[in-house]
Every structure is written in structure tokens, then in C-alpha cells.
From Swiss-Prot:
Cited HAMAP family: RecF
NCBIfam families assigned to the protein according to its UniProt record, in alphabetical order: recf (TIGR00611)
CDD domains (alphabetical): ABC_RecF
Protein name: DNA replication and repair protein RecF
Species assigned in the record: Bacillus thuringiensis (strain Al Hakam)
Length: 375
């Protein structure tokens, strides 16, 4: 699949923009704070209905405006689709072929993207929240039911946390309601857990050989899910629910005292092992970056295996963060099969066939100038 054109209105520092793209490589060049990352972000937001940079939608709207809009034309193997996302202070509304979608979960996954930005290099050594977000965003693209379960889980979690804070003063009168929320949380949480297990099993199948290739056969990558309760992938759903319920009973008083939910998928984590050593703790910066690169390249292949079309790859100021060898491995892997967007302050130092015949987009203070490099 590829995005053939985009239109922006009141998006970040863009008052109005209409732009067409090449189906292979598009290089967005500009100095810092000119709008190149905003353009890249707009493509991501059009696909995912949320930003990878902020959770505050108001930041996506141009200063002193009430709304922002992103439109795009998506070309798939057997169809051409128009996508539209309208952003206001009240929230977001999505349209697909001019038809408004009742739920964003119906819209997400139509256009698949893989974002690789400098902060993704922190996927290994960053906080558990970074890794959970990685799971949620990537799984949501290929499993709409996951997004539904996640949204329901988060609603119940908010209600349960509010009740726990209320119970800090007097817990006896609210225990029945707490049990109701606990059972609802377990119901949605176990389904989230199962989907994560399934996803990571597939990701492992793709990431391990990719990592082996980048490391020239010297390293074996293993991805391990670390749940906040003592459950495993081999357990059936009823057993997982049973373990969750027992765990919630054992931490009930601590949760009331702390006023928050202490276990569940929102507290889980991922660990990455290279040659049986925890990369987060014992890995070199090179191993951590190889692991992050392996995961991103695995995402591309995993999405293709699930939806039978390659996703759009967004490389936001990340090539300069990779050494020549990893940079070449990345560009060799995607060459000719994935529509790719690259942001950079300069193409100097990036010598690769992939960038030949790329469309070059120069961004200066929210305006663009385009050319196709046929050198």
C-alpha cells in the first residue's frame, strides 16, 4: 500500500498544504523546527488517529484555530481509498470514503504504518510504558478487537482507580462495587493478555532471524513478556482469570491504601535477551540499537503476513542515529517493496540506491518545495 497524496488544514505549523508522494521513497529535508517532523506525524496520525509525540490532541491544531484536518488518498492492491481525520477540542472524527466512522477502532488498521524515530531506540532501555505503548499501537493496527478490549479495560481501570481513592476513607461500603469492577477488569484484561501473547509469538518469529542477520550470525534475540501476575502463555483463559482473581484478592488492601490498581496489563512489561543476557541491563548501545532495529523490521514483515500488503515506513530523523552498517541493512531490507518517508536535515552521508529517484520535499517554516531526484 502507499499514500499518494495528503492535504493538511490548520495542522501544527501548516495553515494549508496539498502534496503528492512517490510510491517508493520520499525524502523530507529541512532544518529543525521547520515542519518536517510535523508532516511525518500527520501521515502517522492519519493512519493511527493519534500522535506518537503527544497525547494532547489540542497540540495538533494550528495556534489560534479551533480545528485541524488531515486528508489522504491511499492506494491498496485492489482499491483506492480516501481517508479523513478531523480534530477539534471535542475530539476526533474519522471518515473513510466520505463516510463517517462511528468508532475510531473501525478506522484504525485501514492504513498501516511503521514509525521509526530516535525515541524508538529507547524501546529497549526506556520505561515499561514505552514498551506497552509499542504493543498497543502495533497490535491495534492488525487486531481491531484488541483496540476495543483495550478501550473497555481503560474505562473500567479509571472507574476502579477512582473508587479505590474513595475507599481510602471508608472501604467497607464500597467492596461490592470494587468486586464488580475487578471482574470487569479481569474479563477485558485476560483478552488483552492473550492477544499480546499471540502478537509477541509472531514478532519473535520475524525478529530473531532479522537480528541474527544484522549481527552477522553472532547474536540470538529472545522476546519475553513479563506479566504483573504469575500467568503464562500455556494457560487457558479460565486459568488466567482464576490467577488474576486470586492476585487481586491478595493485593486488595494494598490497592485501597495506595488508591490505585497495582496489577493487570497496564503494569506488564517486555524484556529482550541477546544470547541469554538481558539487553536492557547488560547490552551495549550497539546491541540495544540492533534490537530496536530488528523489532521495527519485524513489524514490517509481520504486518505484511497479516494483511498481505506492506505498511508505509516512516523514518523520522533516525538514519543519522544509526551507524553505516545498520543504516545500510535497514535500507537494503526495505528497498523496492515499502513506501518510505525519510526526514533529515541533509542527505549528505546517506549514500544508498534506495534514495535514488526519491522525491525530495524541502520544508521551510510550514511551506514545501518538491523535486524528483533522478541522479
Amino acid at each position: 500500500m502507499f499514500i499518494s497524496e495528503i492535504q493538511l488544514k490548520n495542522y501544527r505549523n501548516y495553515e494549508k498544504l496539498e502534496l503528492s508522494f512517490e510510491d517508493k521513497v520520499n525524502v523530507i529535508i529541512g532544518e529543525n523546527a521547520q515542519g518536517k517532523t510535523n508532516l511525518m506525524e500527520a501521515i502517522y496520525v492519519l493512519a493511527m488517529a493519534k500522535s506518537h509525540r503527544t497525547s494532547n490532541d489540542r497540540e495538533l491544531i494550528r495556534w489560534d484555530e479551533d480545528f485541524g484536518q488531515i486528508k489522504g488518498k491511499l492506494q491498496k492492491r485492489n482499491s483506492s481509498l480516501s481517508l479523513e481525520l478531523n480534530i477539534s477540542k471535542k475530539g476526533k472524527k474519522a471518515k473513510l470514503n466520505q463516510l463517517e466512522q462511528q468508532k475510531l477502532s473501525q478506522y484504525i488498521g485501514v492504513m498501516n504504518v511503521v514509525m521509526f524515530a530516535p525515541e524508538d531506540l529507547n524501546l529497549v532501555k526506556g520505561s515499561p510504558q514505552v514498551r506497552r505503548r509499542f504493543l498497543d499501537m502495533e497490535l491495534g493496527q492488525i487486531a481491531p478487537v484488541y483496540l476495543y478490549e483495550l478501550s473497555q479495560y481503560q474505562k473500567v481501570l479509571t472507574q476502579r482507580n477512582h473508587l479505590l481513592k474513595k475507599m481510602q476513607g471508608n472501604s467497607k461500603n464500597e467492596e461490592t462495587m470494587l468486586d464488580v469492577f475487578t471482574l470487569q477488569l479481569i474479563e477485558h484484561g485476560t483478552k488483552i493478555l492473550q492477544k499480546r501473547f499471540e502478537f509477541l509469538h509472531l514478532l519473535q518469529e520475524w525478529a530473531a532471524p532479522i537480528h541474527r542477520g544484522i549481527s552477522r550470525g553472532l547474536e540470538e534475540l529472545e522476546i519475553v513478556y513479563k506479566p504483573s501476575v504469575d500467568v503464562s502463555e500455556s494457560m487457558d483463559l479460565s486459568k488466567i482469570k482464576e490467577v488474576y482473581y486470586e492476585s487481586f484478592q491478595s493485593v486488595k488492601q494494598r490497592e485501597i491504601f495506595r488508591g490505585t490498581t497495582l496489577i493487570g496489563p497496564h503494569r506488564d512489561d517486555l524484556q529482550f535477551f541477546v544470547n541469554s543476557k538481558n539487553v536492557q541491563v547488560f547490552g551495549s548501545q550497539g546491541q540495544q540499537r540492533t534490537t530496536a532495529l530488528s523489532l521495527k523490521l519485524a513489524e514490517i514483515e509481520l504486518i505484511y503476513s497479516e494483511v498481505k500488503e506492506y505498511p508505509i515506513l516512516l523514518l523520522d530523523d533516525v538514519l543519522s542515529e544509526l551507524d553505516d552498517y545498520r543504516q545500510s541493512h535497514l535500507l537494503n531490507t526495505i528497498q523496492g517493496k515499502v513506501q518510505t518517508f525519510v526526514t533529515t536535515t541533509s542527505v549528505d552521508g546517506i549514500e544508498h540506491e534506495t534514495l535514488k529517484e526519491a522525491k525530495t520535499i524541502h520544508v521551510t517554516n510550514g511551506t514545501v518545495d518538491c523535486e524528483i531526484d533522478r541522479a
